[in-house]
């Protein structure tokens, strides 16, 4: 695979203090983001924590907390006015102190909910006891922490535990040294081997996912060959023989992205199913790695969508919706937002593959409301995807004006993500204008879309044929337009089995759109009829 596709730029590290000095707006100020992310109970806990643990002079940060909390947008000038006697330099120090105190409060509040926090707390206690010279007490806590770490497969944590055990044993003989030394050496080697394999597989999964986020599906044989080559060169020789949870998780994720990039949707389905089944076989890990479980369910739904497994899609979505209402999700901001985004996306997909576009429109207001509520915490990529799906919902329902509004949000977004989505947003934008009969701008739009897609190396024969048709369609008499559409449909159907030519179908059902023009029926009606004829429809 070309090195440029998998090159990671190292971001210059910036100090904690400098982050506060360069945060002029709502989306950038990290203290503002943190305070706005807090639930009522978390704010209440912080106030109690700070009053118990701080000196009177430190209570000024409570004033700062309240001032920031009341802001709709971060404004430093307004903030300084609300804190009379505070200089700009003092404000930076106060903000840094407040930020740390909020995190300390959250750590206390959330420790029971996080295995990682619990393990680190135990390690801190063991280290304190070691420094006090209470070696046996320290080792006792380390033993308990090791047991918890092994149960929850937290092998990275074991490295620092074993390192402290070795330090205690080497500097302060506490047990049968020879037997203990041999055991610790074996443990250290075992953990090191395990961590190395997990690191290699997680790197592979992350790099493949990064490629997809940047480019989307493989555009041509060159892309496919480079992905296959990269996978072959970086997949550890004995990866398929691994039995550990994390080894299997990252192995399945690697093959998931590998298959998805190549549009091998059957392989994609097999590995997303393995990903989810891994959690089902070890239910404890759903709590430990909730984020990965949620992502697995999302990808399994996508696989059912790509294969039009209507029944399995419906049952998986129902299971995912039930999980989204569990305390584990509802009590965690990140999981609640993740499940909302993925379930919203899945519900739109369900309407798109069944042709019930109009029935899906009532979903949009709530999605918009939640996106506005979560705007500080939803990544740009996810917003692009949701906006595109909403645009397709309006396109399929025949509301081309609103479809264009949503596509403009993508076209005007300059985030360096998903070249493929940018290309197909422009193509659907062009089709929407065609449907509206905006003849005066079609030719210039065709040229613009053609240039953009060619530049991004996203132009296939199908897109070329569609663009060619659109460019000349308004010069064709109404009597001759139907034969021209039938000709175009035949040319595209001929290419239906070529994965690189039909990647457009992952973004818009071009064939159903053309069939609707030829038969003079709605696109919704065409897709609904296909659904009703499917053996895999919901019964």
Label the model's feature ranges.
Residues 153-160, 195-202, 242-249, 284-295, ...:
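Alpha-solenoid helical repeat architecture
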């Amino acid at each position: 695979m070309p090195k440029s596709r998998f090159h990671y730029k190292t971001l210059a590290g910036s100090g904690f203090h400098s982050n506060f000095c360069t945060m002029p707006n709502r989306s950038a100020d990290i203290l503002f983001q943190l305070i706005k992310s807090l639930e009522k109970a978390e704010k209440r806990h912080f106030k109690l924590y700070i009053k118990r643990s701080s000196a009177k002079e430190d209570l000024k940060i409570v004033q700062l907390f309240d001032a920031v909390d009341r802001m709709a947008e971060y404004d430093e000038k307004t903030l300084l006015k609300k804190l009379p006697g505070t200089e700009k330099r003092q404000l930076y120090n106060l903000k840094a102190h407040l930020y740390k105190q909020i995190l300390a409060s959250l750590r206390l509040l959330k420790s029971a909910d996080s295995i990682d926090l619990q393990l680190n707390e135990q390690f801190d206690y063991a280290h304190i006891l070691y420094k006090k010279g209470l070696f046996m007490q320290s080792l006792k806590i380390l033993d308990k922490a090791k047991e918890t770490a092994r149960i929850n497969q937290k092998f990275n944590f074991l490295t620092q535990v074993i390192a402290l055990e070795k330090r205690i044993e080497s500097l302060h003989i506490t047990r049968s040294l020879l037997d203990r030394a041999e055991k610790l050496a074996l443990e250290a080697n075992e953990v090191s081997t395990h961590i190395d394999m997990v690191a290699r597989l997680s790197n592979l999964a992350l790099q493949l996912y990064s490629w997809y986020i940047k480019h989307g599906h493989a555009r041509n044989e060159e892309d496919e060959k480079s992905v296959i080559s990269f996978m072959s060169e970086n997949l550890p020789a004995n990866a398929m023989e691994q039995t550990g949870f994390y080894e299997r998780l990252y192995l399945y994720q690697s093959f998931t992205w590998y298959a998805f990039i190549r549009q091998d949707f059957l392989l994609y389905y097999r590995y997303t199913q393995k990903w989810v089944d891994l959690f089902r076989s070890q239910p404890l890990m759903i709590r430990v790695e909730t984020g990965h479980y949620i992502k697995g369910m999302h990808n399994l739904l996508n696989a059912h969508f790509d294969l039009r497994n209507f029944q399995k899609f419906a049952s998986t979505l129902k299971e995912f919706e039930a999980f989204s209402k569990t305390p584990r999700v509802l009590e965690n901001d990140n999981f609640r937002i993740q499940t909302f985004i993925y379930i919203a996306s899945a519900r739109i997909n369900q309407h798109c593959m069944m042709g019930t576009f109009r029935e899906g429109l009532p979903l949009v207001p709530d999605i918009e409301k939640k996106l506005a509520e979560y705007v500080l915490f939803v990544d740009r990529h996810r917003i692009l995807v949701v906006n595109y799906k909403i645009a397709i919902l309006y396109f399929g329902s025949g509301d081309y004006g609103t479809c264009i509004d949503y596509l403009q949000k993508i076209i005007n977004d300059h985030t360096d993500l998903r070249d493929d989505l940018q290309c197909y947003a422009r193509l659907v934008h062009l089709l929407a204008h065609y449907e509206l009969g905006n003849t005066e701008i079609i030719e210039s739009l065709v040229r613009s879309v053609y240039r953009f897609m060619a530049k991004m190396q996203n132009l296939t024969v199908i897109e070329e044929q569609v663009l060619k048709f659109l460019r000349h369609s308004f010069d064709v008499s109404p009597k001759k337009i139907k034969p021209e559409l039938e000709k175009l449909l035949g040319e595209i159907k001929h290419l239906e089995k070529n994965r690189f030519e039909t990647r457009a179908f992952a973004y818009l059902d071009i064939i159903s759109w053309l069939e609707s023009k030829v038969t003079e029926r709605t696109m919704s009606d065409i897709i609904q009829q296909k659904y009703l004829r499917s053996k895999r429809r919901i019964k």
